[in-house]
Amino acid sequence: MQANGEPEPMPSPEYVERIQAYMAKALHEAKINTSWIQPNLQWDAAMRDFIAKILDPSSRNKFVPILLPVAQEIARLGAINSLTQTLLKLTSPGVPDIYQGNEVWDYSLVDPDNRRAVDYNRRRDMLQALSTATPRELQTWPDGQIKLFLIQRVLRFRREHADLFRRGEYLPLRASGTFSECCVSFARRLVNKWIVVIAPRFSSRVGFPLVDERWKDTVIELPETLSLAQAHDLFTCRPLPLRDRKVKLADALSILPFAVITSL
């Protein structure tokens, strides 16, 4: 993976070794043709040779050029899932937990691959850069800055309104429209304090990027218990147009593929 988050045009020797180690663990723990206790050395060697050949960086290899576009599409959908999971984790009832290094995209495999050292200097530099970044600039998602931005904004908001997250009730919200099944939404409310969380799911049905008019007529219905005066998005600080206590996803997700609406 390059510094900008884009994949390398060809696999490096280090990457090949990581995939071989991952496959060895998967095969041994499946215990079908080889295992840790009874290793099949020929089978293990054949697996390593197979991985080395399909990831051969030479021009003779026709597999990698076919794999890359598929991997890039999966990565985009995976990024949306990661953002949704992170937002739900930070706003749902309970205490959120973020594994070290996962403040941005983490391309680690299972252990021992996920025990590699975390580049904290890079994350520190990215965090400092957020002070001048605009939401639209974060649409270049491969570098992972959009995830760090989400975490920073929500954790700061949680700290400022701790009671809302500690004691606020959870209210599931209903979506309607063309892509009603492709979003999840809920509110947290404590007396006159509230937030409404909106995040995508099944994003391949909507298309990429998951913003603006792709959502068509999809809306979230807001409960009567929420005072909607001065409602705005936490991430973009934009006021949101509301009609009949409904918010259109084309408005709420016009810049970023997630939203936290609040009047605080």
Give residue spans per PLM region.
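Carbohydrate-interacting/catalytic domains
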Residues: 1-264
